[in-house]
Amino acid sequence: MSRYTGPSWRVSRRLGVSLSGTGKELARRAYAPGDHGRDRRGKLSEYGTQLREKQKLRFMYGMTERQFSNLFVRAGKIKEGTHGANFMALLERRLDNMVYRLGLATTRRQARQLVNHGHITVDGKRVDIPSYEVKVGQIIAVRDKSKNLDIIKNAVEAVVSRPSYVDFDADKLEGKLNRIPAREDMNADIDEALIVEFYNK
């Protein structure tokens, strides 16, 4: 299954969650898109509830179904912690997400583009793979040639706060993952237990 590249606001309204993290998609119209959007949300079945939760998280991180399910399987092989929390931590450690969390981009989609276009380095080496798994202590930085990009400077200036599991040097435009993200650090609007139930059926 290919990655969705259409308008994120349509998916946000359909799933009832802000995929950009800004909340703007739902500010004016909190119902699903289309002529019957206001009336479309009836009571979901157990399967429907699990599927919607899975789709919310998958679209939030901008992943294909194959990428998402493969990472879920990997999380299940981690011996410590719960399957759901380990899965969430692996999602957070994707390079595109870390670029977003450091405040080098205003959305995950924008962060993915920065990585794809070669603007980001890890430990001094250019990495253009959004799914690259960042390890604790690795330095994520903007390439010297890219430091004057308005899209990056504007994103850094707009940051209000950063998660406690990252450190950031605004002068150097670089940061790092200082520890594995704990479940309480991450999105409280996601019920990962529903996703575990969905895949374990």
Curated annotation (Swiss-Prot):
Part of the 30S ribosomal subunit. Contacts protein S5. The interaction surface between S4 and S5 is involved in control of translational fidelity. Belongs to the universal ribosomal protein uS4 family. This is Small ribosomal subunit protein uS4. SMART domains: Ribosomal_S4, S4. The lineage of its organism: Bacteria, Bacillati, Bacillota, Bacilli, Lactobacillales. It comes from Limosilactobacillus reuteri (strain DSM 20016). GO terms for molecular function: rRNA binding; structural constituent of ribosome. Keywords: Ribonucleoprotein, Ribosomal protein, RNA-binding, rRNA-binding. It comes from the Bacteria. Coiled coil: none annotated. One of its GO terms (cellular component) is small ribosomal subunit. Pfam families: Ribosomal_S4, S4. Residues 26-46 are annotated as: Disordered. NCBIfam families: PRK05327.1, rpsD_bact. GO terms for biological process: ribosomal small subunit biogenesis; translation. The gene is rpsD. Residues 93-156 form the S4 RNA-binding domain.
